[in-house]
Design a protein with these regions (language model features):
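Structural detector for hydrophobic anchor residues on beta-strands
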Residues: 11, 23, 33-35
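Short, charged, surface-exposed hinge/linker loops at domain edges
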Residues: 1-12, 45-89
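Short secondary-structure boundary micro-motifs
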Residues: 9-10, 17-20, 40-42
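Short aromatic-glycine-(Arg/Gly/Cys) micro-motifs in beta-strand/loop hairpins
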Residues: 15-30
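Acidic-residue sensor for enzyme active/binding pockets
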Residues: 16-19, 38, 52, 81
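A short, exposed loop/beta-hairpin motif centered on an aromatic-Gly-Thr core
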Residues: 31-42
Length: 89
């Protein structure tokens, strides 16, 4: 599920070439996730790493993670998760 979230978030990546020739990119749904690089590929690779680190920090500090394309990876209380998976038919 985490890999799918990262892939979905990366489809929202926006980037531009700066005046100095480097590339700058962000993932708008994930506030604070940005990177730059000498090439688009280098920037995208760094951007993905920053997104992964941002998720770790968000989990560690119980910061709500935005739902992206239906992917909700926020931790749920055990009782709520149990109720969702064991609903009466």
């Amino acid at each position: 599920m985490l890999i799918e979230y990262i892939q979905a978030a990366m489809t929202h990546a926006e980037f531009e070439q700066m005046e100095n020739g480097r590339y700058f990119g962000t993932v708008p749904p994930c506030q604070g996730v940005w990177a730059d690089g000498e090439t688009v590929d280098a920037m995208r690779e760094t951007l993905r790493e920053v997104l992964e680190d941002w998720l770790i920090v968000s989990f560690r500090h119980s910061i709500e993670i935005p739902v992206v394309d239906g992917w909700d990876i926020n931790p749920k209380p055990v009782a709520e998760e149990y109720a969702e998976t064991h609903q009466a038919a």
